[in-house]
Amino acid sequence: MAQPLVIGHACAAGEAPANTLAGVRACLDAGADAMEIDVQLSSDGIPVLMHDETLDRTTNLSGPVRSRSCAELQAADAGDGEPVPTLADVLALVDGRLTVMCELKATPGEADFDQRLVDAVLADIERRDARTWSAIHSFNPDMVARARATQPRVSATIISGPVQGDEVDRLLGALLKRNGQAVSIEYPCIDRALVVKAKRRQVTVWTWTPDSEEEWARLIEAGVDGIITNVPHKLSAYLARR
């Protein structure tokens, strides 16, 4: 059975502050195949790494991410003295050594702002000539569609929470309608039947975010293509022992 790809979550959130350059280095050190990052726009339109809509939980700042300039965010402490990095910072550090999966955070009711985020991220990818080692991920199918229409050479994934039965068919249909290549599904609902259904439609299956050997073993048996984990070093070591 083929081994799944090792994909760090929020860079490597269980090994370094989430969405920081320290996390990028942890993924690289672990020999990860890919790394998922969360991307939003600063007030001056620069793609930066941040999971939450607000800064309160993970930095020493407060308020919405989009209310702060890039300079303010880079002066913040995102954990252990790490600044909030820009997407450009991350792409420069990675330089093609792993795939950078950019999860684009949608803003409900603000389609124009979402489009600006898609366009800004793709522009950074273009500037770094990173089309072959970058990908777009989003819970928002419209953002996936815009990304694929704008830059077909960059692969795209629709993210989903738990799905079962007809919900799986609807998810796969939504992906293919938007010319995407993969789904990223919350791990508890993943089973062999779901993966087989996706494979029949030539859809890649990622899963998030299991951190235990028991779950990794189950997901490998199910046939997933990649595991998004907070602990890429541990997953890499586990796969090396199999």
Language model regions located:
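Phosphate-group recognition and catalysis centered on beta-loop-alpha active-site segments
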Residues: 1-242
